[in-house]
Amino acid sequence: MNLGSLVSETRNPDTLDLDALPTLEMLRRFNEEDKRVAYAVSETLPEVAKAVDAAAAALTRGGRLIYMGAGTSGRLGVLDASECPPTFGVPHGVVVGLIAGGPGALLKAVEGAEDNAQLGEDDLKAIGLNARDMVVGLAASGRTPYVIGGLKYARALGCATAAISCNPGSPIAEAAEIAISPVVGPEALTGSTRLKSGTAQKFVLNMISTGAMVKCGKVYQNLMVDMKATNVKLVDRACRMVMEATGVTREEAEAVLTQTEYEVKPAILMVLTGLDAQAAHARLAAHNGFLRAALQP
């Protein structure tokens, strides 16, 4: 396998003098390269949309959204998964991040783990993967055996699958139903895919998880109304969301939130409809948690 032929491994002609540049000019070069990321991701939006719809469908049928990757890619998946419970109020374990080598690999590289295709399958078996789930494989190179092994196993079970890589026509793209390949070009630091490639993957993960949660009723307007108010900052945000969605004062927002144990969706519904807390919860349940639908007469 000629890894040197991968776009992500080639040398960038615009940064050949990186080690001779003054600090500010070096940072300008980094910044110019970073500007390419958003455009590269924009070219993949039709495929990202398919992944969002597939993820939302998996969550709606009681399945999970599972990310898997090695190194930087794996860490990005774990990061995105860990943000979903506080942001969208989903239970831990609904969005899962797997990294080659296990949790210890988040802090220290586990040598050889990414080269083991069987390990990818084994990690999915260990969490009880089933056909209701969706698996998203991440690898900047697009050829990580751990991810390929996992995707092949997931497809054999009938899971929805997507692959995110930064090299076109990659093996993981071929292993998944949905291929998302933002080609960001050579890195400023040759082969350091934690730079543009990592940023592109994070952009895509942000869209997949956020988009899926919007489609699952976790958002009203552009407010994260299923957020868990677990600290002072988030309690304040809950108050502001109720105020912004309904026009009430802070005191009124706080009063209604105390009746819902600081759950924002029923609080908004109570203010806008006059329902009590119990009835607001019941109406939300009848509309599968979609606040906009619950507000319709």
Swiss-Prot record:
Inducing factors: Induced by MurNAc 6-phosphate that releases the repressor MurR from the DNA. Repressed by MurR in the absence of MurNAc 6-phosphate.
Gene name as annotated: murQ
Note, other: A lyase-type mechanism (elimination/hydration) is suggested for the cleavage of the lactyl ether bond of MurNAc 6-phosphate, with the formation of an alpha,beta-unsaturated aldehyde intermediate with (E)-stereochemistry, followed by the syn addition of water to give product.
The name this protein goes by in its record: N-acetylmuramic acid 6-phosphate etherase
Function: Specifically catalyzes the cleavage of the D-lactyl ether substituent of MurNAc 6-phosphate, producing GlcNAc 6-phosphate and D-lactate. Together with AnmK, is also required for the utilization of anhydro-N-acetylmuramic acid (anhMurNAc) either imported from the medium or derived from its own cell wall murein, and thus plays a role in cell wall recycling.
EC number from the UniProt entry: 4.2.1.126
Assembly and interaction partners: Homodimer.
A single GO BP: N-acetylmuramic acid catabolic process
Keyword list, A-Z: Carbohydrate metabolism, Lyase
Catalytic activity, as annotated: N-acetyl-D-muramate 6-phosphate + H2O = N-acetyl-D-glucosamine 6-phosphate + (R)-lactate
Active site: E83, E114
Residue ranges constituting the SIS domain according to the UniProt record: 55-218
Name of the top EC class for this enzyme: lyase
Family: Belongs to the GCKR-like family. MurNAc-6-P etherase subfamily.
Pfam family, one: GKRP_SIS_N
Pathway: Amino-sugar metabolism; 1,6-anhydro-N-acetylmuramate degradation; Amino-sugar metabolism; N-acetylmuramate degradation; Cell wall biogenesis; peptidoglycan recycling
MF terms in GO: carbohydrate derivative binding; carbon-oxygen lyase activity; ether hydrolase activity
Keyword Lyase belongs to the record: yes
